[in-house]
C-alpha cells in the first residue's frame, strides 16, 4: 500500500484529503514513498514525470521516474537545492551538469541563478551592486579576464566580483591565454606589480601617464604601474615606458623620469635622496635630485665646462654644471640631475661658485675651502647682479681671483692678473708700501722695494739699486691646476679632481610623502 505523507516543511500545497479506509480515490498532491522519496500525483492519481510542479512560492522537479530531484541540475539550466526547491536569485558552487557523473578534483565552480531560476551565461551581470562575468556554460569567471581589448580582474575563485581601484597582482600564468600578451610581458614587467582598474573595471594600459586622485602615474602597455626611474616615460606610447635597467648605458638623461618607489609610484616632485638610474649608469651613487613633474633639474649639454679627456674625470666624460634656482634658492646640478656640492665652475656664468654640504649656494667669505689637500679662503659676491659669483681683483685690501684669495706661501708673492701685477703676503693682504723691503718668493730675491699706483706694481728695485724685473716670473692664479676656464683646456687636470670635492648628501627635512626641502 502507498504511504501518503504531506510535504510540510518546504511545500505549502493544500492538505491531502483524509485517507479513506477503502483508499478507493486520491486527491492530487505530494506523497512520500517508503524510501523517503517524494512524488507528485495528479487528480487522476497518475504520477507526474519530467515536469515542474509549483508548491506555494517554490518550484520542484519530478524526473522521468517521477522522483523529486534534490541537489541536482535540471536540463543543464536550472538547479534544485537539497530541499528540492529551484534556486532563484542565488549563488551555488557545484560541479557542472556534465561532470556530475564523473567529478574531477577541484572541479566545482560558482553559478548564479536568476529570478526565473536560469543560470546566467555568456554575459556580465550586476548582482547586489557588484559586476560578475560568466562563460558560455554559466561558470563565474575569476582572476584575469580579457573581453576584446579590455582587461579586467575578477578576484579569486570564490570572489569573482569585477575589481576597481589599485590592486597588487601577479602577472597572468602562461595558461591565461586570453590575457597573456596584454597583461604580461617578461621583458618589461615584474612578476608582481600594481595595476589600476577604473570605475568600469577596465585596466589602465597603453598610456604614458594617468591622473589618479590628483597624482600622475605611468603604466606600460601591459598595465603594470612603472616606478622609480623610468626610461622613455615621456613618450606617448606605453610600450616605450619601460622600467629602469633595460637600456643600460644607452639612455639619455632627457629620457628619464622618476616616479617614487613601488609602494607609492606617483610622479615625483621635490627633493629626493635616491640611488641613480641604472640606464644612466649612476645607480652606484646615492645623490640628491630635485624633480618637477618627474623630470630632474639638470645641466643641459650647452652647460659644458670645456674640461674633457681622461685627465679630467675618472671616466673621461665631459663636465657639465648648471646653477639652477629651486624654491627660491640656487643649487648646482650636473647633466644627470645629481646635485653638486663644493666649489663648482658654472659655464653659463663663466665663474666659480660655492655650494655647501647641503647644496645651498653661498655668498660672502668662505674659509677653509678644500683644495689639493690644503684649504683656502674664498669670497663670493653678494650683490650687483653677481650674486654668488667668485670675485676678481681687490676687495677690502685683499686680492681675489675667481673668488680665491691669492696668498704667498711664506714671504711675499707677485701675481699677474690680466696685464696688472700685485704683491701679497701669506695672508693674502695686498701690499703698497714703497719704503718696505720685501723678500719675493717667486724667484727668492730678497730686499726688493716697490712703487705702486694703488695696489698695482709700477716699478721695483733690488737691494743694490738695480731694476728688478717684476714681470719676468709672476705667479699665475689657479684653482687646483686650472689657470683659466676657456674651452681650450682639454689637457689640464680638472680642478674638480684636484680640490678633492666629496659630494655628500645631508638631511634636508625631506619627508617620504612630500620630498620637501627645508
Locations of the language-model features?
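Extracellular adhesion/carbohydrate-binding repeat motifs centered on closely spaced tryptophans
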Residues: 2-495, 499-502, 506-508, 512-518
Amino acid at each position: 500500500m502507498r504511504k501518503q505523507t504531506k510535504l510540510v516543511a518546504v511545500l505549502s500545497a493544500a492538505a491531502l484529503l483524509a485517507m479513506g479506509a477503502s483508499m478507493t480515490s486520491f486527491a492530487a498532491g505530494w506523497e512520500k514513498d517508503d524510501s523517503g522519496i517524494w512524488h507528485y500525483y495528479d487528480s487522476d492519481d497518475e504520477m507526474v514525470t519530467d515536469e515542474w510542479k509549483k508548491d506555494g512560492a517554490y518550484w520542484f522537479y519530478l524526473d522521468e521516474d517521477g522522483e523529486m530531484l534534490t541537489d541536482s541540475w535540471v536540463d543543464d539550466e536550472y538547479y534544485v537545492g537539497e530541499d528540492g526547491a529551484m534556486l532563484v536569485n542565488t549563488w551555488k558552487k557545484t560541479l557542472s551538469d556534465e561532470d556530475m557523473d564523473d567529478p574531477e578534483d577541484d572541479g566545482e565552480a560558482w553559478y548564479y541563478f536568476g529570478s526565473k531560476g536560469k543560470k546566467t551565461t555568456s554575459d556580465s551581470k550586476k548582482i547586489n551592486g557588484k559586476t560578475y562575468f560568466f562563460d558560455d556554460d554559466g561558470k563565474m569567471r575569476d582572476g584575469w579576464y580579457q573581453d576584446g581589448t579590455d582587461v579586467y580582474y575578477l578576484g579569486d575563485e570564490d570572489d569573482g566580483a569585477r575589481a576597481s581601484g589599485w590592486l597588487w597582482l601577479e602577472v597572468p600564468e602562461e595558461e591565461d591565454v586570453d590575457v597573456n600578451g596584454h597583461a604580461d610581458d617578461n621583458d618589461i614587467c615584474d612578476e608582481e606589480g600594481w595595476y589600476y582598474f577604473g570605475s568600469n573595471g577596465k585596466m589602465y594600459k597603453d598610456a604614458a601617464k594617468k591622473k589618479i586622485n590628483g597624482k600622475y602615474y605611468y603604466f606600460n602597455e601591459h598595465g603594470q604601474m612603472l616606478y622609480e626611474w623610468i626610461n622613455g616615460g615621456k613618450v606617448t606610447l606605453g610600450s616605450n615606458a619601460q622600467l629602469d635597467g633595460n637600456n643600460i648605458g644607452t639612455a639619455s638623461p632627457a629620457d628619464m623620469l622618476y616616479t617614487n618607489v613601488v609602494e607609492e609610484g606617483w610622479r615625483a616632485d621635490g627633493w629626493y635622496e635616491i640611488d641613480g638610474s641604472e640606464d644612466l649608469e649612476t645607480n652606484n651613487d646615492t645623490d640628491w635630485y630635485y624633480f618637477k613633474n618627474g623630470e630632474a633639474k639638470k645641466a643641459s649639454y650647452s652647460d659644458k665646462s670645456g674640461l674633457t679627456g681622461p685627465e679630467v674625470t675618472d671616466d673621461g666624460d665631459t663636465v657639465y654644471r648648471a646653477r639652477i634656482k629651486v624654491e627660491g634658492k640656487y643649487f648646482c646640478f650636473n647633466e644627470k640631475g645629481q646635485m653638486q656640492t663644493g666649489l663648482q665652475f658654472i659655464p653659463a656664468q663663466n665663474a666659480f661658485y660655492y655650494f655647501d654640504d647641503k647644496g645651498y649656494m653661498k655668498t660672502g667669505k668662505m674659509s677653509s675651502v678644500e683644495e689639493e689637500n690644503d684649504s683656502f679662503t674664498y669670497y663670493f659676491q653678494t650683490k650687483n647682479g653677481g650674486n654668488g659669483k667668485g670675485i676678481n681683483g681687490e676687495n677690502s685690501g685683499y686680492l681675489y681671483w675667481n673668488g680665491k684669495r691669492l696668498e704667498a706661501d711664506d714671504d711675499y708673492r707677485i701675481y699677474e692678473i690680466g696685464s696688472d701685477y700685485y704683491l701679497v703676503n701669506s695672508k693674502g693682504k695686498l701690499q703698497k708700501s714703497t719704503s718696505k723691503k720685501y723678500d719675493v718668493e717667486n724667484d727668492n730675491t730678497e730686499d726688493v722695494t716697490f712703487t705702486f699706483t694703488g695696489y698695482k706694481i709700477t716699478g721695483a728695485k733690488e737691494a743694490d739699486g738695480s731694476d728688478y724685473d717684476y714681470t719676468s716670473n709672476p705667479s699665475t692664479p689657479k684653482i687646483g691646476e686650472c689657470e683659466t676656464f676657456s674651452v681650450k683646456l682639454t689637457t689640464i687636470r680638472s680642478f674638480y679632481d684636484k680640490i678633492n670635492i666629496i659630494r655628500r648628501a645631508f638631511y634636508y627635512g625631506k619627508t617620504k610623502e612630500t620630498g620637501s626641502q627645508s
